[in-house]
Amino acid sequence: MKKMKASEIRQKYLDFFVEKGHMIEPSAPLVPIDDDSLLWINSGVATLKKYFDGRETPKKPRIVNSQKAIRTNDIENVGFTARHHTFFEMLGNFSIGDYFKHEAIEFAWEFLTSDKWMGMEPEKLYVTIHPEDTEAFRIWHEDIGLEESRIIRIEGNFWDIGEGPSGPNTEIFYDRGSAYGKDDPAEEMYPGGENERYLEVWNLVFSEFNHNKDNTYTPLPNKNIDTGMGLERMTSISQNVRTNYETDLFMPIIKEVEHVSGKKYLIDDAQDVAFKVIADHIRTISFAIADGALPANEGRGYVLRRLLRRAVRFSQSLGINEPFMYKLVDIVADIMEPYYPNVKDKSNFIKRVIKSEEERFHETLEEGLTILNELIKEAKNSDQVIKGHDAFKLYDTYGFPIELTEELATQENLSVDMPTFEQEMQQQRDRARQARQNSQSMQVQSEVLKNIQDESQFVGYETTDYQSLITHIIYNGEEVKHVEAGETIYFILRETPFYAVSGGQVADKGTVGNESFEINVTDVTKAPNGQNLHKGIVQFGEATQNAKVEARVNKEDRRLIQKNHSATHLLHAALKEVLGDHVNQAGSLVEPERLRFDFSHFGPMTQEEINLVERRVNEEIWRAIDVRIQEMSIEEAKSIGAMALFGEKYGDIVRVVNMAPFSIELCGGIHVNNTAEIGLFKIVSESGTGAGVRRIEALTGKGAFLHLEEIETQFNNIKNHLKVKSDNQVVEKVKQLQEEEKGLLKQLEQRNKEITSLKMGNIEEQVELINNLKVLATEVEIPNPKAIRSTMDDFKSKLQDTIIVLVGQVDGKVSVIATVPKSLTNQVKAGDLIKNMTPIIGGKGGGRPDMAQGGGTQPEKITEALRFIKDYIKNL
């Protein structure tokens, strides 16, 4: 067999099937587009569902791809086995109603055994088939010439996921030889068994039946082929290494981890797990971020965060206790660049996101471990179980992974109350799901809508008023002829000027009706077959199917939306110009009142950057650029520099919104005719929505003017209160007042210290010796809650070897602070003192072993709390 690089195997596979008349389907982003059923693209066929289910017809019925994929259903196995991965590449060839079993098997055999391609030894190949698939057996045995002894019948060789296409499959195995195990059926040492000797290299699925609702199977009118070959596994065979991790896809990463850690791979089995986890997870994280995912606390973002934190935990077992994962991104980019340039193109952004996450997790670990250690102590003193509520709070409030809580609890021979934890998690999911319920409300109607094939033409680019016809009315999930006033309905027009919500632009609102009835249109979405689906309330009369109507869009709202949408394009271009090409749209909202734009950028924008972006947008508005809308081929659009939104799928003909030379972007939305119509652009806020994502909210036109007018009014009020005449004097006057306040506060603080000192007398005389420890636990007078910290500083300077606990009250609120000399923290911890004391005063608190703070709401319990401190130390 030929020894080849992974990149060579990938290219040979694609070249082979192109020779066989296949069309290359480019690898799709890992974040699914328009497929809510998937968290990630998890297979080669996942991106081709549109062809298999008939939604789209491919240019050619023969397709080949190398699709990057993520599977996270068994994360905990990654690192402990030879071939488990969260990120992998699936090579696949597919036939949509074209060739079938004979060609699929012949193609596979030729690619594997021909010297021109993989050059595998035929005698090392075995296959499995379904026992009843006599056709596959005949092809393998008679046409290919495979001995009957190398064709194994296995009942499980049938691809079936329930209702829908299904069929038998044949798997091809490579025998790596007796070095990987002697033949022994008792140990499953045979093709298809759980062993390291016979490796599955290719799975050919023959979709020839439809699995019906009544669990019967009927032949499909169009039979399909769906195959999959794991690139990592094939590479390990070609390079003759024991596991996928020793291939050129992983070893450069592992070599760098060796360099950073000073440890060696393949010396210690437990240590090897850490190397594998890091090498696998950094590939997944790098590609996922490059494809638009970002670490977060839910959904795919949580998967990324979990993977990164798992890798960091394993890196600590190699002695790496600082952020370093981000340094591996360039290595991943170099390995994968021949076919996936995206990681290298976005490497700086990816590294910044990962580094920030690593830094935050190291902080989280430190803080979370302190809290977890207290929970472990409590569990040991009670029922040996960490409460589910506490574990959830640790996860939800501090971001401490539940997996790590379980792991550390197990090390202490404790368990975690997971049922309660899961119950808390489910309640959190339920809260999140409430926000999504509206988007699912049409599922009842969807079966009706699927059957509506009539076209509905959108005429809203040219007009806001149009004479049309109601072709369909849906009420309570059923298609009806008439609906009375007061009811909410969904309906379709033969032609409509109403824009359906899309690309961040909200739907048009307005009215549809005639002399007999009127419908107030409140929303417009896309129906399953592409028509604009209007939602509205019948205002008067009886809405009737096939009625001729006047469709009128709210013109004022439309005009404001146009301004905000065109301004969004200018904003996007300005952000790229000012911040860099890594900026990509991560979400947008264009509505009449304002615009909101989410974009990928690491860290808050400076005020200077915000001002510059705002100025650039306004400059393009004042240049009065004609906005040209053109339809052209995707290739032509790219040639003129049109910006496409990352991850979006575009057809052969695209709509280009051209504000050249500043902004050229693919877009289906509605825009102004000239940028001067926008009038004015004003950013009102810049904030973060998650790791690596920033959000700008802005106003245009009249809204921007009114906002500035309000600011000017407030400024003039401030000027009047400050009693200054010139605008330029305002800042100087404020600075003067701030300095005066600072001086007065210092004087007040000094006076309070003097008063406290006089009242306290000689504080050294108040120190008690408790359990051979010097202790001062007392109440002090403070003017405000913050003053207790400065009071403590004074006490500490005089009593450096003393445990000090101070309590003060202001307006019925209690403030507590404790310090313990670092030399004594092995005996008593400030955090423990505060944590156990504050419940007495109706509060809570905590902190480090040497310093902690807290508060409460029951000043009448201060004496009791101070007595508790002394008793606590006495009983240590």
From Swiss-Prot:
Free-text comment about domains: Consists of three domains; the N-terminal catalytic domain, the editing domain and the C-terminal C-Ala domain. The editing domain removes incorrectly charged amino acids, while the C-Ala domain, along with tRNA(Ala), serves as a bridge to cooperatively bring together the editing and aminoacylation centers thus stimulating deacylation of misacylated tRNAs.
Pfam families: DHHA1, tRNA-synt_2c, tRNA_SAD
HAMAP family documented for this protein: Ala_tRNA_synth_B (MF_00036_B)
Alphabetical list of PANTHER family matching this protein: ALANINE--TRNA LIGASE, CYTOPLASMIC, ALANYL-TRNA SYNTHETASE
Membership in a protein family: Belongs to the class-II aminoacyl-tRNA synthetase family.
High-level lineage: Bacteria, Bacillati, Bacillota, Bacilli, Bacillales
CC annotations in GO: cytosol
NCBIfam families: alaS (TIGR00344)
Record's protein name: Alanine--tRNA ligase
Cofactor(s) the protein needs: Zn(2+)
Gene3D superfamilies assigned to the protein according to its UniProt record, in alphabetical order: 2.40.30.130, 3.10.310.40, 3.30.54.20, Bira Bifunctional Protein, Domain 2, Threonyl-trna Synthetase, Chain A, domain 2
Annotated compartments: Cytoplasm
EC number, as in UniProt: 6.1.1.7
Cofactor note: Binds 1 zinc ion per subunit.
Chain residues that bind Zn(2+): H565, H569, C667, H671
